[in-house]
Swiss-Prot record:
It comes from Fagopyrum esculentum subsp. ancestrale (Wild buckwheat). Pfam families: Ribosomal_S19. The keyword Chloroplast applies. One of its GO terms (molecular function) is rRNA binding. It is found in: Plastid, Chloroplast. This is Small ribosomal subunit protein uS19c. NCBIfam families: rpsS_bact (TIGR01050). Disulfide bonds: none annotated. Gene3D superfamilies: 30s Ribosomal Protein S19, Chain A. Belongs to the universal ribosomal protein uS19 family.
Length: 92
């Protein structure tokens, strides 16, 4: 279910403050965040945001094609290592 157009996209306040500060200074530095639910907005383009995946922060460079998506979509939390090769219990 999509968000209502009457509402604005969710972006964490601390993330907006950091972005506004960097945009006024015209500096580029890595922004560390735990807010995976924040929506990518046009003011984030060109910045690198380190998104927490539960274990570490993964740096993601924001491009114009990412607008409207959530930050958590670009930081996978699970690491699938494949199925067991010799699983004799499941064959019984």
């Amino acid at each position: 279910m999509t968000r209502s157009l009457k509402k604005n996209p969710f972006v964490a306040n601390h993330l907006l403050r950091k972005l506004d500060k960097l945009n006024t200074k015209e500096e580029k530095e890595i922004i560390v965040t735990w807010s995976r639910a924040s929506t990518i907005i046009p003011t984030m383009i060109g910045h690198t945001i380190a998104i927490h995946n539960g274990r570490e922060h993964l740096p993601v460079y924001i491009t114009d094609r990412m607008i409207g998506h959530k930050l958590g979509e670009f930081s996978p939390t699970l690491n699938f290592r494949g199925h067991a090769k010799n699983d004799n219990r499941s064959r019984r």
